[in-house]
């Protein structure tokens, strides 16, 4: 159970586990600070509140836009600046949105309604097995269905985009569904297969990073609809955009692989302390963020983000982690996050800074 402390900043910290001496030294010399920005209610202290922000899950932003938050608990998307200021737009996203991405193309991922058609600027996956798109020229207040895989029982927990494709992590069917620019289902030569992932684990989080697709795997519950959080459960893989396995980045069965229903993924930029350039992996299960550095064809555990007194950051119900765009969504060296604290009954939007 997390212990929350809310001084001028909001930080939940837990100290457990064993790390290597080298990792410990890096962590001690590299403190981070958590800042609460917006929550759904006063029970989760933050400078601002927004009742729609319940179980905030996915985060996306364009090159200059504010953050778009996928609020799984209210089936909405709300917008925030990097400073935590709410933008006066709330979009309805049916089915409990999870992952979200920005689309910069004026011709890809077209949605239609009442004789109008237009490219979706922001896209969402939901737990009902659909991909929806928001187009301001078609319907300014509601995201519209572009692809529907509910008929095969799909449960989409995440969404990524690369080139003119969408990648949705289908947790129920333990696969990655890929859609072309017209929302048509695509079969790729690689198929996003890793024979070393045991049965009972399924694609959970998914992000396009550094030209490749990174996928986290979590343990399925009996119905194969929700994750089973527990220390030491999970994997992270790297694939090409064609679904060919590049590397198994993290195997929780090995030493120094502290996964616990990991979902969030981000590449740290220059200026993010000693973990600059590393792959950051955020756990939903215990709220911790671990760093991995690429070393040739392998990835090496470097440690976890910690506050000044050495205890690891632990954000209750942690989902998305993503860096700002240098414009409306905040500095490129600031790591933003969404979470669903209190058993996903609340929501928090915040940031993490180095130093």
Annotate the PLM regions.
Residues 1-10:
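Bacterial N-terminal signal peptides that target proteins for export
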Residues 21-355:
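Sequence/structural signature of beta-propeller domains
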Residues 10-18:
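Bacterial N-terminal signal peptides
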């Amino acid at each position: 159970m997390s212990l929350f402390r809310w001084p001028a900043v909001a930080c939940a910290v837990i100290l457990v586990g064993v790390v290597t001496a080298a990792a410990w030294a890096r962590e001690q010399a590299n403190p981070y600070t958590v800042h609460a920005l917006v929550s759904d209610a006063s029970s989760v202290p933050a400078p601002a509140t927004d009742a729609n922000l319940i179980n905030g899950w996915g985060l996306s932003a364009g090159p200059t836009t504010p953050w778009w938050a996928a609020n799984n608990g209210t089936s909405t998307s709300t917008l925030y600046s990097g400073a935590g200021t709410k933008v006066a737009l709330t979009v309805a996203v049916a089915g409990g949105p999870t992952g979200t991405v920005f689309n910069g193309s004026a011709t890809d991922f077209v949605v239609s309604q009442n004789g109008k058609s237009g490219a979706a600027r922001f896209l969402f996956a939901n737990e009902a097995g659909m991909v929806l798109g928001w187009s301001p020229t078609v319907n300014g207040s509601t995201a519209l269905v572009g692809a529907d895989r509910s008929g095969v029982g799909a449960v989409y927990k995440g969404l990524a985009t690369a080139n003119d494709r969408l990648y949705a992590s289908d947790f129920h069917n333990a696969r990655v569904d890929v859609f072309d620019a017209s929302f048509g289902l695509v079969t790729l030569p690689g198929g996003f297969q890793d024979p070393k992932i045991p049965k009972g684990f399924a694609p959970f989080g998914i992000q396009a990073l550094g030209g490749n697709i990174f996928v986290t795997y979590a343990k399925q519950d009996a119905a194969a609809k929700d994750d089973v959080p527990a220390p030491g459960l999970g994997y992270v893989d790297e694939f090409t955009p064609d679904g060919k396995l590049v590397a198994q980045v993290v195997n929780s069965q090995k030493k120094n692989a502290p996964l616990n229903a990991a979902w969030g993924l981000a590449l740290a930029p220059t200026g993010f302390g000693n973990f600059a350039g590393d792959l950051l992996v955020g756990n939903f299960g215990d709220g911790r963020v671990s760093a991995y550095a690429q070393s040739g064809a392998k990835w090496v555990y470097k440690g976890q983000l910690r506050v000044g007194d050495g205890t690891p950051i632990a954000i209750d119900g942690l989902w998305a982690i993503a860096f700002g765009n240098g414009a409306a969504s905040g500095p490129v060296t600031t790591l933003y996050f969404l979470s669903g604290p209190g058993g996903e009954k609340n929501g928090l939007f915040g940031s993490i800074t180095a130093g």
